Amino acid sequence: MIRQFSAGSSFTARHACEICRQRKVRCDRALPRCRRCERLNQACVYSPISQRRTRDEQLQELQERLAKTEAQLALDAPRGPASSMSSQSRSDSAAPAASRVPSVSASVPNSAATNPMDMVGTRSSNTSMDLPVNTSPMLDIDLFTAGADSNMALDWNPYLTALEPLDNLLPNRLSPRSLPQNGREEDISLAELNALHNYYFESVYFSFPFLNRDRFAGESTGNGPAINALIYSVALAGCTHSSPQHTKVSIYYTLARNYAEKCERDGQLNDLNFLQALLFIGRFEAMEGKVESSWMTLGRAAMLARLLRLPQMDRLEESTESQDGSGLSLLETTDPALLEERRRTFWALYILQSYIKTRTGWQCMLGDIKTFQINLPSPGLLRSDLTPLKMPFISEIGTEPCPEVSSYAGCVLMVDLALRCLDHAQGHGATNFWDGYCALVKNTDELFGMLKQHLNATSIRKDPVAFSLYLNLRATEIFSHESAIARSKEQGLPPLMTAESQRRATAAAFQISTAVRLNLPSPWKVDSDIIMLQAIFIAWPLAMALKAFYRELEHGGSRDSVNGVVTSSRLLFAALGHIEESGGHWHQSVAHVEAKLQELDEKNGFNSLAL
C-alpha cells in the first residue's frame, strides 16, 4: 500500500526504499527505515516523488511492463507439444438482470446451457479471467505430471510487482475489520442496487453459482423480509468485489442482517430466499475474517436446512415422513430448475461450513454426509429453462454410473475427500492409519481422473470454481502426505519410508504455484480478479503448499533446486498477501516459512519474500 506522508512533508507518496527496489523484494515503506533495512542495519533511503501518478497512468505502465514480460517469456521459453486440452464452449448471452427495478432487463437465450462448466456458461467479454496475452507459454504447463515444473528458473519478479498496485485497488481481504452497525434503505438508490445485482450475476456469481437469476429477478419486485434479505445480501456480494461501491459494504451488510433477523422474528423460516441470504452473509463474514460470526450465521443456515429436510429432499416417496417432528417445509414443487436450485443451495452451505472446519477444526452441523439423500449438483447454467441431469447421491459415487460431473459437483466431492483426510489425520478413521492413508491416496488419484476435464490450464483460467477445485485437491494431496510423514516420525520409521510422500507433496506444491501463476490478475481488469473471487477457498491451499516447501527448504539440496522452491514460495506469499493482510490467520500459520525464507535471503543471497 502506498502511504501518504504527513502534511509537512515535501512529497506525498513514496516507492519502496532503494535497497528493497534493487533486491526486488517487498518493502513495508515505513519511516524512517523500513522493517527490512532496520533488521539488517542498512541505510534506508526513499526517492522523492514530485507528483502522484494517476491510476490510469499506473495501469498503462503495468500493461506495458507485463506485455514486455510476456514477449520475453515467449522468446526464452520453448513451447512444448500442442496441448490436447479442449477448450470449453461458453455462451455469450446473459440471463435477466436481477433487480427491484422492473424496467431493467436483459435478453434470455432460448436453449438451455449444456456446458458442464455451469458457472462459465455466460459471461460478458469484459469480465473474462485472462492473462495479458493469451498466447503465453503458460497455457502449455503440465498440471498433472508428478514433479512437473519442480525446478523453476522463471523470474517471477515482474508478476510479483504487478500484484502491488492491485493491493491498493482491491481493499477486500481475509482480515477482520470493524463495520458500522448502521444502515438505512434511504441511503441506497434503486440504480445502485440494480447495478450491484447486475455486477454480481455477470462476474461474482460464477465463483459460487447457487442462485437462479431468473427466479431472483421475478421475486425481487415483491416485498417481504426474506426476499429483502436476499436482495441486500446479493448486493453485498456484488459490493464486496466492486471497488467503486466498496464504501457502502457496511450498509448492505446491516440491511441484509436486519431483514434476516426479521424473518426469524416473524416466523418466516420456510423460504429459500432466507436460507440463501444466510449463505451470502456467512460467506461475507468469512471473507472479512470474522470466523466466529460466520460460523454462527452458517450454523443458523445449517439448522434451517435440517428443519426443511434438505439433506433428504431426494429420497424415495415412501420414506419422506418427517423423523424430526419439524413442521417446517418448503413448498412442494415439480419445477426441475427450482429443485436444482435447492440442491445447489444446500451444497453451497456444505462447502462453506467445511471451509470453516479446515480453519478451526469445528465440526459441521449438517450431519453425517453418508446419510444425505440429496442429488449432487447437475451440470448446466442455473436458470428457469434448465433441465437438470439425474445425478446420484454422494454415497453412490463409484458404485453407480454417473453422468458428466460439473466443477461445482466436483467441489462437493473434493470437500468430502478433504474432510475424510482431516478425520483420518486426527485418528477418527475406522481402519489403521496406513491402510487409511493408502485408501485416501487412491481416492485422490481417482478423483483427479474423474474431474480431469475441469483441471486443465484452460479450465482453471476461465472457471473460478475449477481453479479453487484444483488448488484444494492438490492441498488435500499435500495434507495426506504430510500426515504420513508426521506419523512415520512418531513411529520411528526410516526416512526412506516417506521419501515418496515428500516427493509427491512437493510436486503438488509446485503445481499449486503453477496454477496461481496462471491466474495472476490483470491490472486493467481489477474486478475480474479470480484469486480474490475465490479468496476464502484458496487460502488453505496456499498455506499447505508453503508448508510443503518449508519441509523441502529444511531438507536442503542443490542451489538450483532450493532456488526453485524459494521462487515458488515467493509467488505463493504474494498471492496470500493479496487476499489477506500480513498478520492474518493464514499468514500466522506459515510464519515459520517466512522466517526460513528470510534466513536464506540473508545467508545465501536468495531473493526471498520480505513481508
Swiss-Prot record:
It comes from the Eukaryota. CDD domains: fungal_TF_MHR, GAL4. SUPFAM superfamilies: Zn2/Cys6 DNA-binding domain. GO terms for molecular function: DNA binding; DNA-binding transcription factor activity, RNA polymerase II-specific; zinc ion binding. The keyword DNA-binding applies. Its main location: nucleus. Keywords: DNA-binding, Metal-binding, Nucleus, Transcription, Transcription regulation, Zinc. GO terms for biological process: DNA-templated transcription. Residues 76-125 are annotated as: Disordered. SMART domains: Fungal_trans, GAL4. Gene3D superfamilies: Zn(2)-C6 fungal-type DNA-binding domain. It holds the Pfam family Zn_clus. One of its GO terms (cellular component) is nucleus. Residues 17-44 bind DNA. It is found in: Nucleus. Residues 78-113 have a biased composition (Low complexity). Transcription factor that positively regulates the expression of the gene cluster that mediates the biosynthesis of depudecin, a highly oxidized eleven-carbon linear polyketide that acts as a histone deacetylase (HDAC) inhibitor and makes a small contribution to pathogenesis. This is Depudecin biosynthesis cluster-specific transcription activator DEP6. It comes from Fusarium langsethiae. The gene is DEP6.
